[in-house]
């Protein structure tokens, strides 16, 4: 039987920080105190309990992400979520390291297997949601940046030339959110507080 490949080595300082974090978690009664806010996780982090229990906050997953799409969660995301990895589609998107041998680099870099991904093609990070009130295409500007970058046939232009999301085909890669230029349109998108198309947790979209 082949041996399981060893993960990256963890420094004493990182291990100590992780141990302190784990102690806090257990002192608070564990994952039942997870906040209600759901975060978008990297590939292999969709098992929330496994991720929170195993994450050492070492940020190795963030460091190796070739698309710069991973960021540490903040305290306002919840005390147990703080410094765990979340997706940041304002900075990049996830291609699941499709051209990298061995699958997602974030998964390979995780020293505790808090991220586990055996089949990247089956991973659903989230689902795209379009706000027509902020969409440049809906304002007659002819924008279709999000449609152009989608590699999964999850976006198409509707009869009115406004993007339509095929929720079933969307895996939440975030390319559409990263490419959206609505917030840079000045007065055209006045009042907008986010990009016109964003990725939301699956349960929020399909509820």
Positions of predicted regions on the chain:
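Non-ligating segments of multi-cofactor redox enzymes
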Residues: 1-207
């Amino acid at each position: 039987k082949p041996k399981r490949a060893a993960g990256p080595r963890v420094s004493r300082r990182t291990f100590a920080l992780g141990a302190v974090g784990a102690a806090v978690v257990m002192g608070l009664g564990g994952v039942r105190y997870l906040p209600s806010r759901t975060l978008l996780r990297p590939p292999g982090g969709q098992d929330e309990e496994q991720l929170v229990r195993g994450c050492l906050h070492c940020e190795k997953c963030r460091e190796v992400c070739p698309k710069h799409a991973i960021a540490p969660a903040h305290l306002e995301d919840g005390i147990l979520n703080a410094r765990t990895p979340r997706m940041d589609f304002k900075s990049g998107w996830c291609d699941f390291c499709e051209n990298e041998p061995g699958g997602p680099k974030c998964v390979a870099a995780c020293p505790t297997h808090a991220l586990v991904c055996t089949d990247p093609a089956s991973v659903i990070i989230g689902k795209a949601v379009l706000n027509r009130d902020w969409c440049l295409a809906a304002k007659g500007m002819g924008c279709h940046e999000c449609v152009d970058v989608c590699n999964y046939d999850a976006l198409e232009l509707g009869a009115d030339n406004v993007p339509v999301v095929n929720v079933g085909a969307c895996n939440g890669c975030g390319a559409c959110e990263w490419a959206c230029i609505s917030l840079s349109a000045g007065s055209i998108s006045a009042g907008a507080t986010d990009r016109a198309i964003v990725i939301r947790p699956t349960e929020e979209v399909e509820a």
